[in-house]
């Protein structure tokens, strides 16, 4: 299957690690030029060097901007005024007791998880609609429809992404612009691997053993009973970025390993 992404430029926010990095790699493999984003220039350049060792012909551009701020978004617009594919992957999460979350933490999660995507899409979607061609993808979470009591602030922002995505899809009615949301389940990113290593101190478990125990004890409804790999999410997002996905629009799409017990 050819995804026909040659000649397309994609921006993947938060793409120096985890799911974002895997998405950037997958898009580059399919021929898209990819803008690599992170807050630290050193990390951005390191990621570009790493991806070029995997994909020698890849066209990769650096974007060391803090997109959790209005200033950072404006700097990005000046550097890259137009893209064909926008993947709003940037996000923060942190388990916290609801009664201990201060107002400024709620605002921080809103600024990074919501306003980064709002600001970027406001600029880039307008150009896509004018051209009648483009792709916007929000990376949410299964927490959007199965909120977690241990991360109420995070879950709320993920639910909000679903509403924003659907509203924006309708703005592009009658064009070949699509706006969708992907909801990954628990995924084995670097941060999650670190968490697994700290969950069972003194038990000398391998990462695989800790993963199996975590899934059994904390994600019992998962059908696959393992953590999703970033590459699995990346392949799905790459397909949604391609012309082959033109009939999928305004959708909230689960890639959660069957974690959410629902037929819809």
Swiss-Prot record:
Keyword terms, alphabetized: Oxidoreductase
Residues that, per the record, bind NADP(+): 13-20
Stored CDD domains: SDR_c (cd05233)
Active site per the UniProt annotation: 154 (proton acceptor)
InterPro entries noted in UniProt: NAD(P)-bd_dom_sf, SDR, SDR_fam
GO molecular function: oxidoreductase activity
Signal peptide segment: none
Protein name (record): Uncharacterized oxidoreductase YvaG
Source species: Bacillus subtilis (strain 168)
Gene: yvaG
